[in-house]
């Protein structure tokens, strides 16, 4: 008899709630990511996805709930979360523009080096050994993402897609067990998106669990073992890609449904009911409108005499006031 062991959870978020004054951005969200798993997090703009990421990584202190990594509840401090084994990227690129590609990756190694300030100043044998090991590890990561040949280039000179890759390499430099990617393909063309998809699979093959936010549905459904959908800060549904993309609630969250009393909502309900019954709804009657009353034409005034009136000098004077010398002045002011 063979026994199968359940996958061990790397991340356990329980009842995570985040309030900003009277606004609840995340409400009672539970999410688990297992070892060697890729989990997708989707939802419309403003659903609370990045806020949830910030709660996981210690940038925000959750109002309620807890976050545990490999069974240990994490303190809400970013450097301690990184040291524990969770790394992340951000929606917007946050590279050090005036540092080289290699130096950017070395920045991500600081949580894995034991050398302190005085060691760096004195540059003793221990420091030099640790520095050489960090450079070797950084170069290995650049080789992994295909940027080893650009190690000495300034990061600002890299194409957009390569800057995104460099951010991932910097996050991996901290040797995480869980990698959080916030919209890693934003702004990419289809070729770059496909390359990123292959990179994430390669990261998973290294034993690193991945939790990824993305709006590219084809990318996220091809990539993920499970997908969770957030709507207005709450987890709406969670399951496999096939289950989530076919869920009517998810479709409604993205495309919208007419609310009660909305223009056209009643007509749409009638059409849907008729389609369900297999009949065609009768067209709505157009209310008759009363013809507007035509005012009677006023009879033209008949002059008292048949002789046509002649214009006097007063009739030909321009409109306006007259000064003491008889010259005309405009209502707007005297003409120059």
Tell me the role of every PLM-derived stretch.
Residues 2-277, 333-336:
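Glycine-rich phosphate-binding loops of nucleotide-dependent enzymes
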């Amino acid at each position: 008899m063979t026994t199968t062991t359940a996958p061990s959870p790397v991340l356990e978020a329980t009842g995570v709630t985040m309030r900003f004054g009277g606004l609840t951005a995340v409400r009672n969200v539970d999410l688990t990511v297992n070892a060697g798993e890729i989990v997708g997090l989707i939802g419309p703009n403003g659903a609370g996805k990045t806020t949830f990421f910030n709660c996981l990584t210690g940038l925000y202190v959750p109002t309620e709930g807890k976050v545990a990594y490999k069974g240990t509840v994490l303190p809400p401090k970013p450097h301690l979360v990184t040291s524990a084994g969770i790394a992340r990227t951000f929606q917007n690129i946050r590279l050090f523009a005036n540092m080289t590609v290699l130096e950017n990756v070395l920045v991500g190694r600081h949580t894995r080096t034991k050398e302190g300030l005085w060691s760096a100043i004195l540059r003793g044998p221990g420091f030099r050994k640790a520095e050489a090991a960090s450079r070797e590890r950084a170069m290995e990561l650049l080789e992994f993402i295909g940027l080893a040949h650009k190690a000495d280039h300034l990061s600002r000179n890299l194409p957009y897609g390569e800057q995104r890759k460099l951010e991932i390499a910097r996050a991996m430099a901290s040797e995480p067990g869980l990698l959080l990617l916030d919209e890693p393909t934003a702004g990419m063309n289809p070729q770059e998106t496909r390359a990123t998809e292959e990179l994430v699979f390669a990261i998973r093959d290294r034993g690193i669990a991945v939790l990824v936010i993305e709006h590219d549905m084809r990318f996220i459904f091809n990539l993920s073992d499970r997908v969770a959908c957030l709507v207005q800060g709450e987890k709406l549904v969670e399951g496999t890609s096939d289950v989530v993309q076919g869920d009517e609630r998810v479709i409604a969250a993205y495309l919208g449904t007419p609310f009660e009393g909305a223009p056209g909502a009643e007509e749409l309900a009638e059409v849907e009911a008729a389609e369900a019954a297999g009949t065609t709804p009768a067209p709505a009657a157009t209310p008759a409108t009363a013809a507007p009353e035509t005012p009677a034409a006023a009879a033209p005034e008949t002059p008292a005499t048949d002789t046509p009136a002649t214009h006097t000098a007063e009739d030909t004077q321009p409109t306006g006031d007259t000064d003491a010398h008889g010259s005309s002045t405009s209502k707007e002011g005297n003409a120059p």
